[in-house]
Amino acid sequence: MQILKGMTWDHSRGFDPMVASAKKFNEKYPDIRIIWEKRSLQAFADRPIELMAFDYDLMVIDHPHVGEASRKDLIYELNKSEKFEDQLKSLNNSSVGLSHQSYNFNNNQYALAIDAAAPVSSFREDLIKNIPQTFEDVIKLAEQSQVMWPIKPVDSISSFNSIAANLGYPINEKHEVFLDVSVGKSILKMMKDLAELVPKECLHMNPIETLDYMSTHNDISYCPLLYGYSNYSREGFRNSLVH
């Protein structure tokens, strides 16, 4: 039997589907077994993809890794074989937003989108009456100690880009300038104002930790920006639902 090793991250969203699909694959191809290993989200992000590529046959990656993978020739280009052409077109056409295209670099497809992560707001429906509609509303709620917001560096830049897009200045790789300085300063001012009102722990939190807290405590009702996990809006996943 041929054994293939895979690496993903330690969360039901990243691990459970891989194990389930590996089981289905083994039923169809009994001579091949896929064994998935997992590590924490932070350890997963910190370990260079170059090292993982040498240790594993399959990897769950984030799209920012694609450039390095292409430059160092670390990952097989899925479009190399014509037999996958129809499947790749189908996946692209059914993709949520640019999920599929985000793994395409220099006209090569290096990975498939197994799910879609997008910056969203999250809230406890049982704790909040009026969901904020503007940034000013978020500030007012934060002044009541009701807001949590993951702002580790990698999440801060995601929030920065999201706010820029909502203000009408989406980051575009075709632009020669990343963002106008005056716009950037305005966004940083907004982020600073909110950061001063949320718990200090937010400086070291990621979206999973934020959602875990919101679903198991009753003192936070809202988060303005984080990568969403639909698991938390399903009955029985945690103590309380987070939408």
List where the protein language model places each region.
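Glycine-centered hinge/linker elements that transmit conformational signals in sensory
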Residues: H175-P207
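Extracytoplasmic/periplasmic substrate-binding proteins
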Residues: L197-H243
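Short, solvent-exposed loop/beta-turn-alpha elements that line the ligand-binding surface or hinge
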Residues: E82-L91, S145-Q146, G168-L188, R234-F237
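Hinge/lid segment of periplasmic solute-binding proteins
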Residues: V66-V120, N130
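Early extracytoplasmic/lumenal segment of secretory-pathway proteins
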Residues: M1-G67, S90
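Short helices/loops that flank or line small-molecule/ion binding pockets
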Residues: F44-D55, K72, K140, P207-C223
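Extracytoplasmic/periplasmic solute-binding protein
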Residues: Y110-A113, P119, D137-L179, V183, ...
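Short helix-loop capping/hinge motifs at secondary-structure junctions, enriched
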Residues: D126-Q133, E196-L197
